[in-house]
């Protein structure tokens, strides 16, 4: 995108409000009790940790602090059924989803069952031909795969599995699970998505939405809990299955699914990143190499390097390629597979860029969509596998509910939708369900199918719901800034202190600061979507950078920025990543959010 277009389109973006926090005596007391700085105490309180004991546990995430897995409804029954499958060596089909949570969930359960001696078939449907979740078409192909694998062990083998475990899917598959029951195949569902209506029937369902507990575990976290429950039932399995060694897969799916890194998720990711750094699995070792991930992986490494490559095969082709990478024990296969995923991710970027440009072009012709609170765009020839990425881009730019639909030549559309805090996209789809073929997901992300002729009615229904239930405040971007800091404070001591709050991510954002009274020491330079500059404030100097920023939008004269500290591993120095900036108070320029 050229700078002129980027600058023009910036005028559509939502205004950003800076909300700067304030500390008090309670925060100072917390800092004293913990023996930390007032700033760290302030950041802990900002995250809701005002009790010294709770704050201490937050700073030191331990596996021993994980909640009892049997608190999850259905988990004991699911663990018992899995124990039966292990004892009887029943052929098990693990049926997953094609995103990184689904792939890592499938890999985790398949690896565990194989270690425990269970004959198992792993299957992930093709997005384009079979669609999301348990479908008759996908199940029938999976059963053929089971039959072939059983035939290898001897002729006359049973043509169906003894047990199906649906991971990261199944909650909305009421008819498909009923069909399995008719076929005499038992099923377990381990999923974190919301039901579209009534719950399906299965031997056991592990889904936090059943009892309203509000667990934010991704499906891979639920699979971990299932295996934890299994080990509690049968401690003898621990000799073959060392669950902590599988935490790299748990971190992968948890971060990739952008669930809040609080509670159990924080513990699982903190310990999982450590395990990921050990490069245990050949596939993850090879993928880290082609992705330029260092010896100490971070949440950003997973979110922006590993996860996109693992997602690429499912978006453009067949996610079984990513699953094979996570399951292989061969170094040569791993290196070949990682390189293939890297190439597909480059292809995915090109497709995404073209679709985003076309979507923005549609909005230029229909600017009223930006005032309705719901952006709904669709086109024939768009790639369904990239619709979710484009929806996320539009959400970040405009802070509106977004639905992006890819239609095929027959008018069948597959869409991805994104919500905002306070406006559940699943609820919006439920209200507009009369115009959809099917839908499912959770509050902030969902998928759906719609006929091309029904798109206008769907758009009107969703926009009407937003108008009735929404408020203008929901559609204003807000930056929660901890405090104002001088540029001279942006150094290694502060960075090291802030890292005590890591891992950062959804629900535990990297601390954001306002740096006032700045000017440019040298003109900005742009390359590959990244704008770099040197900031000055008095005698202090600091490198800074921002993504997706046109050089023509750089503010001349005095300005202030909202940003967070970043470690430049190559240059071995601290720099500031710019999130937003604006003229000094009294200036005429509006804020211009970058991220």
Question: Where do the model's predicted regions map?
Answer:
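N-terminal amphipathic/basic leader segments beginning at the initiator methionine
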Residues: 2-22
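Active-site cavity-forming subdomains of large catalytic enzyme subunits
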Residues: 140-143, 147-216, 220-236
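Hydrophobic helix-and-loop "lid/oligomerization" segment in the mid-to-C-terminal part
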Residues: 20-163, 183-184, 232-453, 457, ...
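A short acidic, amphipathic alpha-helical/loop segment
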Residues: 175-180, 375, 390, 493, ...
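Structural signal for conserved beta-strand scaffold positions within catalytic alpha/beta enzyme cores
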Residues: 19-20, 189, 205-207, 251, ...
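Acidic, metal-coordinating catalytic cores used for nucleic-acid/nucleotide bond scission
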Residues: 99, 129-131, 166-172, 213, ...
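Short alpha-helical basic/polar micro-motif
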Residues: 221, 388, 392, 561
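Mid-to-C-terminal polyanion-binding domains and interfaces
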Residues: 80, 84-90, 263, 333-377, ...
